[in-house]
């Protein structure tokens, strides 16, 4: 066993947390040669439930799981961590305006950013999952200015996986045949799943799927609205698929990307493709296993540019609503 990774998981007793913790402990996130210590952060009221999850983790006797703890104290939960998986956030309730949600969650992520900066290991990386994840990530990052901006990520991999599944189903091929699929912008109903640059079995999607109206219409809408569809169907938001997106994102960051392929996450914009510098914006990315880069030179046609503009405007608007927290 080569090393031990300390991972903080916030909102650990929630649905996504429950699906995620066992996958971390089993080695699916960091690999079969990496031991893990899990430090759960939960609200005081949820500590008993979290302790029940700890009992279950213990009962799995995972060889890689060295230690698991739970705390409601930020300093304790983030002590010397190498990874922070910020899953917990306040969900939008009936009658709640989006601006209210941004501000309520903003306060949470201000404090978490400060606590991570104060307590985490020098090599910490942070993945924000709790929605609205792009702007929550922006807030936390701006309250932890001592941590390099290239260590902050927000999750769009679930959207990428949803898009791949839709395209594979339409083309009648296994999902592994779908590659080069990037998600641009916000993890919201404005995101743009970039089918024009996606490949199916190495060929452009537009050559394989002849129904271009479906691609430009229902395909994008299906990906954008998938979360709402799942809530309608099961009476709760997607949890196992979101947890899978977290695992896939971390794997994408720490594993070299296959030549010519990409993976999706939101990172701090350096101005690439005209996305405003400093925004947390979804891009197609590549990794060498250590450093993550925005893939350059991707061609965006007029259709794509229009979609890009819509999601970019939404992220600028969200940023402006929480300016006093940055």
Swiss-Prot record:
User: In this record, what's one Pfam family?
Assistant: Ldh_1_N
- Give me the reactions it catalyses: (S)-malate + NAD(+) = oxaloacetate + NADH + H(+)
Report the sequence similarity comment from the record. Answer: Belongs to the LDH/MDH superfamily. MDH type 2 family.
The SS bond pairs are none
Identify the InterPro entries for this entry.
L-lactate/malate_DH (IPR001557), Lactate/malate_DH_C (IPR022383), Lactate/malate_DH_N (IPR001236), Lactate_DH/Glyco_Ohase_4_C (IPR015955), Malate_DH_AS (IPR001252), Malate_DH_type2 (IPR010945), NAD(P)-bd_dom_sf (IPR036291)
Instruction: List the gene name.
Output: mdh
Can you name the source organism?
Leptospira interrogans serogroup Icterohaemorrhagiae serovar Lai (strain 56601)
* Residues forming the catalytic site: 187
Its EC number is: 1.1.1.37
Q: What is this protein called?
A: Malate dehydrogenase
Cite the binding residues for substrate: 92, 98, 131, 162
Q: Matching PROSITE patterns, A to Z?
A: MDH
One GO term of the biological process aspect? tricarboxylic acid cycle
Q: What are the GO MF terms of this UniProt record?
A: L-malate dehydrogenase (NAD+) activity
Q: Which UniProt keywords apply?
A: NAD, Oxidoreductase, Tricarboxylic acid cycle
Reported function: Catalyzes the reversible oxidation of malate to oxaloacetate.
Which residues are involved in binding NAD(+)? 11-17, 105, 112, 129-131
